[in-house]
Amino acid sequence: MKKALIKDTFREIKNSFGRFISIFGIVLVGVAFFTGVKSSARYMKYSADTYFDNNNLFDLKMYSNVGFDDADIEKLGKTEGIDRIEGVTSIDVITNVHDNDETVQIFSYDFSSDDNLNKITLTEGRFPENPGECVIRDYGIAREPIELGTELAIKDDNLKSTSYKVVGKVSTPYYLSYQYDTTTVGSGKISDVLFISEDEFTGDRYTVLFATVKGAKDEYCYGDTYFDIVTPVKEKVIENADDLSEKYAMLGGYTFYALDRNSHYSFVDYKNCGDRMDAIAKVFPAFFYLVAALVCLTTMTRMVDEQRGGIGTLKALGYNKISIAGKYITYALLASLAGGVLGCVLGLLTFPRIIFNAWNVVYTVADFTEVPQISMCVLAIMIAVLINVLATFASCFSMLTETPALLLRPKSPKNGKKVLLEHIPFIWKHFNFTKKVTARNILRYKKRFFMTITGIAGCTALILAGFGIKNSISKVTSDQYGTIFAYDIAGEFSEASDKDSFYDEYKENKNIKDIYIMTSHMGTAKKSESEDTTKNVTIVSVDDGKRYSGFTGLTYHTSKETAVIPEDGALVTYKLAKDFNLKENDNRSEEHT
């Protein structure tokens, strides 16, 4: 008897292949979208982890106000847990790029070695071979490129040459995007990064030390285990640096900082991008699973209704409820499994690569790294199968409780009854016959009605969300440069200037309506003294908060009322307050860079 029922199940799949494909298709789309988008965050982070490991990105970086010499490096390198330590000289200078004065950051680099920490990779041209040559970080398509052969005039007492010729372009794990460290030179924003030979610097002290930690490379760098290894070593380095304070006591004070990757902007910024993709995967795929349940419920309900007589025959022949329900559950199970497996394959092969390449317009993570996603695939398929099996069981449960005699007879139509509109004669009498039948059927088949409403509402919500995202993004520009930035022209002083004399010079210009001068500098904000989490911030100082509001519109996040910078205290952005859990009257310190 069981063989006959199994044969009948596969015959049913063949005879109603269109229905089978409808369940198969919606499960495929739902699972593909879920696994593809959900795994994108994991792929992005693991690709970055591989890129960092292959190019020896630092685990710890160390700064001091007096720099470091070889003896300092040797002492700190003996700290328990330190694997490698290297000293690098770095300065920020101003040069002319594309007819604009821009601030560039210059790092020393040992081009004779192919295993440096923060190893750079040549993407175009060659490495420097002669004095006065440099390589520049390659932006890809993120900005206007600096061509090979460009001479950059750079005058600084720390450099032996006064100009540097760009002979190559490189990528570096130290910077993944066009967002660099802050600086006190020029505008406070670094525009380009150059690498020159160590011999090009006149001094013999290093400005920063980079170190790797034993065993850290074996761990996933965005996981807790990685930081469980790095953090104790960082604390030991800080303890070991106490001896250096005695060495440099005669200089009037010694300041030492040891920072891990959580204090490095590029590392944290890329993690945040992956987290955003993960957040999207928690919302949108839910709709596809809901639609899959509705499609399965509708399809199987209709199939069960059509085979009412067949179910009665099976019950009359002695098949129990479980065996009969198993036929339809197997039908939905096979469609869900097939769609789920193929959806996982297609989702993992398409979405992660598309999303990774899209983000790589901004970030320079070299290669896409594939990571096993078995648990995620199993979860996605199990959810789809469970939803469809439950929907199938719900569709046939009520019919299986009836006796064979009732099932073998045609199903009695539902009792007719008046709908609400029939009680409103001046509306109902204007309906023709077709409209009256439609109105009655809407309330007669409530399940189908609500499933249709839910499906249409979900599709409309997705379309509306797409247009909403598009409009929100396009509105950012008009809000930013129409409402927030009310000024037409912004300029920067190359050096400190007398405000009053500047006003006197330009107040007679009829083309200028008003001028306001403020002071701003870059800095870092710390969540607390006990934590290393920092954020780059712009600190603005004004002498007249009301006048400043006429040039830059500030509003409170909740009330949307106009905000004015107070004479005593400070205003912070909503995002900074949220990230650091700040409340009114809180005190926080910031450090100038």
Model region roles, listed by residue range:
Residues 73-88, 318, 505-521:
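Short acidic amphipathic segments
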Residues 3, 400-419:
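Short cytosolic juxtamembrane segments of multi-pass membrane proteins
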Residues 8, 12-18, 294-334:
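Interfacial "coupling" helices/loops that link adjacent transmembrane helices in transporter permeases
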Residues 293, 297-302, 309, 333-365, ...:
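Small-residue-rich transmembrane alpha-helices
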Residues 2-293, 302, 321, 361, ...:
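Membrane transport/envelope proteins' first extracytoplasmic loop
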Residues 62, 433-566, 574:
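Juxtamembrane segments of multi-pass membrane proteins
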Residues 1-32, 329, 333, 417-458:
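N-terminal Sec/SRP start-transfer signal
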Residues 29-36, 288-296, 338, 342-346, ...:
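Hydrophobic alpha-helical membrane-associated segments
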